[in-house]
UniProtKB/Swiss-Prot annotation:
Found in the liquid endosperm contained in green fruit of coconut palms, also known as coconut water (at protein level). Its main location: secreted. Keywords: Antimicrobial, Plant defense, Secreted. Has antimicrobial activity against Gram-positive bacteria B.subtilis (MIC=150 ug/ml) and S.aureus (MIC=170 ug/ml), and against Gram-negative bacteria E.coli (MIC=170 ug/ml) and P.aeruginosa (MIC=169 ug/ml). This is Antimicrobial peptide 2. It is found in: Secreted, Extracellular space. It comes from Cocos nucifera (Coconut palm). GO terms for cellular component: extracellular space. One of its GO terms (biological process) is defense response to Gram-positive bacterium. Monomer.
Length: 11
C-alpha cells in the first residue's frame, strides 16, 4: 500500500 503517497496528498 502506498501509505506514504496518501500521506503526502493529505499534506
Amino acid at each position: 500500500t502506498e501509505s506514504y503517497f496518501v500521506f503526502s496528498v493529505g499534506m
